[in-house]
Design a protein with these regions (language model features):
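Surface-exposed cleft-lining segments at the edges of enzyme active sites
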Residues: 72-84, 155-160
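Acidic/aromatic/glycine-rich contiguous surface patches that form carbohydrate-binding/processing clefts
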Residues: 178-190
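Glycan-binding loop/region signatures in secreted carbohydrate-active enzymes
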Residues: 97-170
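Extracytoplasmic/secreted cell-surface and envelope-processing proteins
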Residues: 39-40, 83-85, 110-114
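Catalytic-core region of carbohydrate-active enzymes that cleave or remodel glycosidic bonds
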Residues: 78-99
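Chitinase-like catalytic core of GlcNAc-active glycosidases
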Residues: 1-80
């Protein structure tokens, strides 16, 4: 597996050298782009990542949801809405193989229950800490994250999904077991 750990508090528009765990040596560089920007002329590394459209460089990783079948490199994240993370990845690996990159992006999101859209509201660290202090949390082996289930003052049900350093390590272990070759994002140091 080649790991591309984001530096703590990293801003966009920076390069990250990959590290090949098997060969124990540096690998190709991944460059993080701010939305609507282009890579610097001197960047001759292997790949580019930007979550928003705007870059037309052939080295750009394409999201699996919109990538053409012959895309040279695609990415997905580890945040699944329903089902299981392992099932989601097992569905992608036969299609994309070594072209699949996985973005280890810790989740911290509040969802109404039910949530037909599958889209929650991101919470900042303060709001997340307040929720976890008031409500017991549990580990979800399917989503590979922690969650709190509660009802608000109006009786409406909510679930708060969030990652910890431990759940990120669990996700990383799952990715290794599945044979994922390239992982980038907030990778805990083990």
């Amino acid at each position: 597996m080649i790991l591309y750990p984001f530096p703590p508090g990293s801003a966009l528009k920076c390069g990250i050298a990959g590290f090949d765990e098997e060969k124990r040596e540096p690998a190709a560089e991944l460059y993080l782009l701010a939305p609507g920007t282009v890579p610097p002329a001197e960047f001759d590394g292997g790949y580019l990542f930007c979550e928003a459209p705007g870059c037309r460089d052939a080295r750009l990783l394409q999201p699996v949801q919109v990538a053409a079948p012959d895309a040279p490199a695609v990415w997905c994240d580890t945040q699944v809405s329903g089902g299981s993370l392992e099932g989601y990845l097992r569905g992608l690996l036969p299609v994309w193989g070594d072209r699949l990159w996985v973005y280890l992006a810790p989740i911290r999101m509040l969802f109404p229950v039910p949530c037909p859209s599958g889209v929650g509201t991101p919470l900042d660290e303060t709001a997340a800490d307040a929720l976890t202090a008031r409500h017991p949390s549990h580990f979800s082996p399917e989503l590979v994250c922690r969650y709190c289930f509660f009802r608000d003052e109006d009786g409406d049900a909510h679930v708060f999904l969030y990652d910890t350093e431990e759940t990120c390590r669990e996700k990383l272990n799952l990715l290794r077991r599945l044979g994922v070759r390239r992982v980038f994002g907030e990778i805990p140091q083990t």
